[in-house]
């Protein structure tokens, strides 16, 4: 992880092997830009990166005066620098976007520091020739790039320290998630997932309960058990329950995650190409583990329960079948018409378990549907639920954190598509359209009336795992949901 050091000095007087200067909104006039003629000669238009070798300055464009673009550009800068021979880089403090908000400086510093730190991540566990980055340190000169409209310069050091703490916690939490999601299925089993959760629990002094198939049988979590049937003798299921209890808790929050450590589709077998990347089907459960790490280290004033349903969905003589009827923990019967709609079965029982805790808020995270990716693209998560105020709060706070989110509406016509002639509900829609919403409506069937307005469903199927670099995310897992939900919890508690 990149070390960030704060120095109470000017950018010019800060010592480092290389300088990093952001050119915001094509403004080449700033004193930190040392060789304007060189930039003009090469027709650099404030997009991408440009290395001034003579002055040892890396110029990185920030296309617009926007805090999210600053975060992305900071990440791009480190991705570039780690390929070079510099051990240290210096950078000043930038304030992009509006200065009217009281927290504008803090949010800019968070974005800058998080972007710098995330730029170093690369999953290279299985590479025989690892290329370790020479870059080890970023030195931040506590000097503003442009004057602040408020008296924020007086609180610069305080804000920088708070932002650095946030960036360190968030980077660590995101890396926990990314490492777990990226772990291949021959290692990343339900038992392994529980071991990762136990490490997080030990480090943060959390309660943890890891339950096996016998517990699931006792609790009549038959939908969850059905998904695991083909793997039971080799990779049995685990219900992982993490608990963070501060001395003062304003709210009780339950976070529920789908932890499909591998999904071949079961007897409704996926095409071979569609199986590739299915190690990432544990993205929701992994996000919950990362969230418990983040929320505990940030010391939020909420009792937080993290519930992960970890299992494989495989084929074999004992595999559950299309036409099976399962009796869920809630007592509702489920007609199985497609075994590749398995995540919702696991979540149905896990959501029931979560409601037994009587939380004030329930949020589930799942790489649930390909339909969500078709509808919103691979960079955006979907928000569903009944409570408009709660959905709006998650969307607003999540967007401010830098994640992309959009609300999808439930409606009575789509609800009819999961009706069954022979059971209480069918696990797959009778139509090919609206699949992300019908999956959310299926989960809604297992939410008790008293919790309808307390529940949110977040489908992270798009951004949880993308096979290219984008924004501050490296190839593969992104840790989708962690930044957004952390911001959501913080905003929720402000209103408590």
Swiss-Prot record:
Leading EC class: hydrolase
Reactions listed under catalytic activity: Release of an N-terminal amino acid, Xaa-|-Yaa-, in which Xaa is preferably Leu, but may be other amino acids including Pro although not Arg or Lys, and Yaa may be Pro. Amino acid amides and methyl esters are also readily hydrolyzed, but rates on arylamides are exceedingly low; Release of an N-terminal amino acid, preferentially leucine, but not glutamic or aspartic acids
Record has Ubl conjugation as a keyword: no
Manner of cofactor binding, per the entry note: Binds 2 manganese ions per subunit.
Subcellular location: Cytoplasm
Residues noted as binding Mn(2+) 2 in the record, renumbered to the chain: 258, 263, 281, 342
Keyword flag Transcription: no
Residue positions binding Mn(2+) 1: 263, 340, 342
Active-site residues from the entry: 270, 344
One of the protein's GO biological processes: proteolysis
InterPro entries from the UniProt entry: Leucine_aapep/pepB, Macro_dom-like, Peptidase_M17_C, Peptidase_M17_leu_NH2_pept, Peptidase_M17_N
CDD domains the UniProt entry points to: Peptidase_M17
Cellular component, GO, one term: cytoplasm
A single MF term (Gene Ontology): metalloaminopeptidase activity
Primary location group: cytoplasm
Keywords attached to this entry: Aminopeptidase, Cytoplasm, Hydrolase, Manganese, Metal-binding, Protease
Cofactors: Mn(2+)
EC number, as in UniProt: 3.4.11.1, 3.4.11.10
Function: Presumably involved in the processing and regular turnover of intracellular proteins. Catalyzes the removal of unsubstituted N-terminal amino acids from various peptides.
Family that this chain belongs to: Belongs to the peptidase M17 family.
UniProt-listed PANTHER family: CYTOSOL AMINOPEPTIDASE (PTHR11963:SF23), LEUCINE AMINOPEPTIDASE-RELATED (PTHR11963)
Protein name, per record: Probable cytosol aminopeptidase
Primary gene name: pepA
